[in-house]
């Protein structure tokens, strides 16, 4: 019999390897709802509350906590326990004065890091288009689209945003307040591959026509390594522009 509609269940053994989740305790776990992040780069809010933050002993308790609306993602209340919290999302609990940034640890697992501020987040530009009216629409890594109004999109001085750059988005206003261009000398955060979770400076960018560009980086220990451009997330010049 054919499958009708999206899958609603997820076995623990089939869950992404980077989830911090015991595999053999039970058969099933929570499948994140379709949303701003892919399944391998996010965690359902229920797992964040129960398994990462340890604020609940079971799913029932975690659901009750989430349904109170006291947990915010990027400044917005999220009451759906399947909602995905993904890379660079800012998770806030105002009642406890706690803020967390969703990152990858050096084993590639999705983790939360405490942060001092929750007034902005970094977003990577993954694509951009010119829309009706001649304005530029930036497509960001977390599913959001930001429109940049320009008088002429063909002028380089107005079209300053490039694919691979990062923008600083204010929370909760969701407007662009900063821009970090992709290029040599910039500080990057590696989001995939052998060096996932590392901060490193871009040394060289090798442009390729048919494949992803190759980026050479140097970490704090002076070790140089190469990765593909989709794994490179620009976070600042010498230091990250947000607390990471």
Curated annotation (Swiss-Prot):
Transmembrane segments annotated in the record for this chain: none
GO annotation terms (biological process): translation
Lineage: superkingdom: Archaea
Provenance organism: Methanococcus maripaludis (strain C5 / ATCC BAA-1333)
Family (UniProt): Belongs to the eukaryotic ribosomal protein eS4 family.
GO terms assigned for molecular function: rRNA binding; structural constituent of ribosome
NCBIfam families to which the protein is assigned, alphabetical: PRK04313.1
Cellular component per GO, a single term: cytosolic small ribosomal subunit
InterPro entries: Rib_uL2_dom2, Ribosomal_eS4, Ribosomal_eS4_central_region, Ribosomal_eS4_central_sf, Ribosomal_eS4_KOW, Ribosomal_eS4_N, Ribosomal_eS4_N_CS, S4_RNA-bd_sf
Protein name per Swiss-Prot or TrEMBL: Small ribosomal subunit protein eS4
Assigned keywords, A-Z: Ribonucleoprotein, Ribosomal protein, RNA-binding, rRNA-binding
Residues annotated as domain S4 RNA-binding: 43-106
One Pfam family here: Ribosomal_S4e
Cystine crosslinks: none
HAMAP family registered for this protein in UniProt: Ribosomal_eS4
Cross-referenced PANTHER family: 30S/40S RIBOSOMAL PROTEIN S4, SMALL RIBOSOMAL SUBUNIT PROTEIN ES4
């Amino acid at each position: 019999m054919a499958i009708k509609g999206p899958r609603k269940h997820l076995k623990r053994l089939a869950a992404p390897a980077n989830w911090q989740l015991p595999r053999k305790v039970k058969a099933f776990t929570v499948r994140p709802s379709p949303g701003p992040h892919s399944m391998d780069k996010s965690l359902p809010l229920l797992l964040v509350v129960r398994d990462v933050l340890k604020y609940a002993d079971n799913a029932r308790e975690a659901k009750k906590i989430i349904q109170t609306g006291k947990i915010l993602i990027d400044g917005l209340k999220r009451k759906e326990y399947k909602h995905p919290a993904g890379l660079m999302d800012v998770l806030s609990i105002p009642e406890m004065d706690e803020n967390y940034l969703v990152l990858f640890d050096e084993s590639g697992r999705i983790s939360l890091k405490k942060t001092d501020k929750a007034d902005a987040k970094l977003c990577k530009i993954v694509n951009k288009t010119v829309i009706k009216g001649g304005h530029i629409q930036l497509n960001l890594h977390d599913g959001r689209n930001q429109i940049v109004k320009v008088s002429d999109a063909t002028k380089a001085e107005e079209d300053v945003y490039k694919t691979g750059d990062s923008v600083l988005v204010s929370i909760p206003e969701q407007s662009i307040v900063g821009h970090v261009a992709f290029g040599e000398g910039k500080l990057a955060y590696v989001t995939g591959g052998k060096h996932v979770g590392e901060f490193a400076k871009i040394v060289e960018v090798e442009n390729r026509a048919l494949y992803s560009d190759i980026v050479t980086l140097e970490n704090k220990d002076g070790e140089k390594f190469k990765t593909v451009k989709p794994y490179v997330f620009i976070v600042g010049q010498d230091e990250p522009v947000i607390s990471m």
